[in-house]
A protein has these predicted regions:
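Conserved catalytic breakage-reunion loop centered on the nucleophilic residue
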Residues: 1-119
Length: 119
């Protein structure tokens, strides 16, 4: 991966990138972005559990209870869960390998849209 690609990735998601340096679920190995096994499993768990009806709050508490690491010294919160559930990179791009299916992402987006439209 060239200099330009690395800089583009670095600035792609500033709030997460500045703290994590890499999108949750991935790591850099020999210049390539590959799934980080434990984090990728957590991403898959978040999508699957949300699609069974769990709330952001429930997911954040469950991940904390299970001592799933996010960043050193940080506890999971609803914003972290929301960012993961909103991130389309998890279905795969030229740079990021797929961790979830496009159907899962679409189902999550539909559920979120329905929740927002309920009075």
């Amino acid at each position: 991966m060239g200099w330009k690609s690395q800089n583009t990735l670095k600035g792609e998601n500033n709030d997460m990138a500045s703290k994590r340096k890499m999108v949750f679920g991935y790591r850099m190995e020999f210049g390539d972005i590959i799934p980080s096994p434990n984090e990728a499993e957590t991403v898959q768990y978040i999508y699957a559990t949300y699609l069974t009806g769990a709330s952001f709050q429930h997911l954040a508490k469950e991940l904390d209870k299970r001592d799933v690491p996010y960043d050193a010294g940080k506890r999971w919160n609803v914003n972290m869960v929301a960012r993961i559930l909103e991130d389309s990179r998890y279905i795969g791009t030229e740079v990021y390998p797929a961790l979830i299916s496009a159907e899962q992402l679409q189902a999550v987006q539909e559920r979120r849209k329905q929740k927002r439209s309920i009075p």
